From Swiss-Prot:
Residues the record lists as binding substrate: N274, G331, I332, M333
Protein name (Swiss-Prot/TrEMBL): Succinate--CoA ligase [ADP-forming] subunit beta
Pfam families associated with the record: ATP-grasp_2 (PF08442), Ligase_CoA (PF00549)
Cofactor annotation remark: Binds 1 Mg(2+) ion per subunit.
Record lineage: Bacteria, Pseudomonadati, Pseudomonadota, Alphaproteobacteria, Sphingomonadales
InterPro entries for the chain: ATP-grasp (IPR011761), ATP-grasp_succ-CoA_synth-type (IPR013650), ATP_grasp_subdomain_1 (IPR013815), Succ-CoA_synthase_bsu_CS (IPR017866), SUCC_ACL_C (IPR005811), Succ_CoA_ligase-like_bsu (IPR005809), Succinyl-CoA_synth-like (IPR016102)
All copies of domain ATP-grasp, residue ranges: 9-254
Species, as recorded: Erythrobacter litoralis (strain HTCC2594)
Positions annotated to bind Mg(2+): N209, D223
Function in brief: Succinyl-CoA synthetase functions in the citric acid cycle (TCA), coupling the hydrolysis of succinyl-CoA to the synthesis of either ATP or GTP and thus represents the only step of substrate-level phosphorylation in the TCA. The beta subunit provides nucleotide specificity of the enzyme and binds the substrate succinate, while the binding sites for coenzyme A and phosphate are found in the alpha subunit.
E.C. no: 6.2.1.5
GO biological process per UniProt: succinyl-CoA metabolic process; tricarboxylic acid cycle
Assembly and binders: Heterotetramer of two alpha and two beta subunits.
UniProt GO cellular component terms: cytosol; succinate-CoA ligase complex
Length: 399
């Protein structure tokens, strides 16, 4: 689950991490009121969307010369003007795609006199099974270009979670940032605080960009992104309440209500599979046969008729879907139960695209009989390769 910048900063502040004063706003009036509570005379007005590149982004509804989603304001009047331009308009960044995201929230913060900018992030390094701490002296809006053009300026420090954060990790961070004296000590302390927050909150990613050194010699978190492991939200009810569903794909939100793991993709073949590994293999073989998957959808090990029906409805809400491939291995789940769900769902949604079903496992023959006697134009498949070839052929024939 992704958090907005102001939400992430609210959480980090609880760990004693230095954060510039700021206030979230849903309206122009709230933005102005928030700015009046800050020392000034400089303010920063930030669009709050779940995407990076806001500073270099452009608003669809504004002219090409308009400012982006992060703006410096030199007065309360400037704050008001920026808030009026940003709220309700669509911000397009390198991470949103051409469709952009509508700005519904702002974050007004106090301006900071910046001496230097750095980059510091933490991610789950799945290859090593450790936490990867990524550090660079080249923080700011161009960090992606730095990673591409001068990767030697980026240092990665791995931390074994079984061992935890050790003093030498903090020293390594400070050394990578080329800090000395009091700033060196601040960096070591900050690295430990961030690691503690990362582990306590079950983060998948925590990015500080930029981490800034102020003119008076303080390290402050100027901007941050935070992503929480959705499977751990039951441990963080306060964090779960921060979820902003308006920033998420509506189909993915609906799928989560039925405990379906759904991710929309750009292809034309809808997929309904049980098990993440089998789902990925199914998508791979669809591509191998010259088509592209329209989604990842894992119905899990306890699919019911209700869940299968919901899955079909979610898949068919995507106008790009031209056919559906169902690939089920019945272990805990019985194939006859799945077949009954498929028949009920196909009739309820008035399926009008080709449907290929491959069943294997417990009660597979009963499942195949149910499909064969359903009176629906369901195409059976014997194995994964056969299923992929058939759905691609059916879609081409129906085109």
């Amino acid at each position: 689950m992704n958090l907005h910048e102001y939400q992430a900063k609210e959480l980090l502040a609880k760990y004693g991490i230095g954060i510039p004063a700021g206030h979230a706003a849903l309206t122009v009036e709230e933005a102005v009121a928030g700015a009046k509570q800050l020392p000034g005379p400089l303010y920063v007005v930030k669009a709050q969307i779940h995407a990076g590149g806001r500073g270099k982004g452009k608003f669809k509804e504004l002219g090409p010369d308009a400012k982006g989603g992060v703006r410096l304001a030199k007065s309360i009047e400037d704050v008001e003007a920026s808030a009026r331009e940003m709220l309700g308009n669509t911000l397009v960044t390198v991470q949103t795609g051409e469709e952009g995201k509508q700005v519904n929230r702002l974050y007004v913060t106090d301006g900071v006199d910046i001496a230097s900018e750095y980059y510091l992030s933490m991610v789950v390094d799945r290859a090593s099974g450790r936490v990867g701490m990524i550090v660079s002296t080249e923080g700011g809006m161009d960090i992606e270009e730095v990673a591409h053009s001068t990767p030697e300026k980026i240092t990665t420090i791995t931390i074994d979670p079984a061992q935890g954060f050790m003093p030498h990790h903090g020293r390594a961070v400070a050394f990578a940032l080329k800090l000395s004296g009091d700033l060196n000590k601040q960096a070591q302390k900050l690295a430990k605080q961030l690691y503690t927050a990362f582990m306590d909150l079950d983060c998948e990613m925590l990015e500080i960009n930029p981490l800034v050194e102020t003119e008076d010699g303080q390290l402050l978190v100027l901007d941050t992104k935070m992503s929480i492991d959705g499977n751990a939200l039951y441990r963080h009810k306060d964090v779960e309440e921060m979820r902003d569903e308006t920033e998420e794909d509506p189909a993915e939100v609906e799928a989560s209500e039925y405990d379906l793991a759904y991710i929309k993709l750009d292809g034309n073949i809808g997929c309904m599979v049980n098990g993440a590994g089998l789902a990925m293999a199914t998508m791979d073989i669809i591509k191998l046969n010259g088509a592209f998957p329209a989604n990842f959808l894992d119905v899990g090990g306890g699919a019911t008729t209700e869940k299968v029906t919901a899955a079909f409805k979610i898949i068919l809400k995507d106008p790009a879907v031209e056919g559906i491939l169902v690939n089920i291995f019945g272990g805990i789940m019985r194939c006859d139960t799945i077949a009954e769900g498929i028949v009920v769902a196909a009739k309820e949604v008035e399926l009008d695209v080709p449907l290929v079903v491959r069943l294997e496992g417990t009660n597979v023959e009963k499942g195949k009989d149910i499909l064969a006697n359903s009176g629906l134009p369901i195409v059976p498949a014997d194995d994964l390769g056969d299923a992929a070839r058939k759905i691609v052929a059916e879609v081409k024939q129906a085109a």
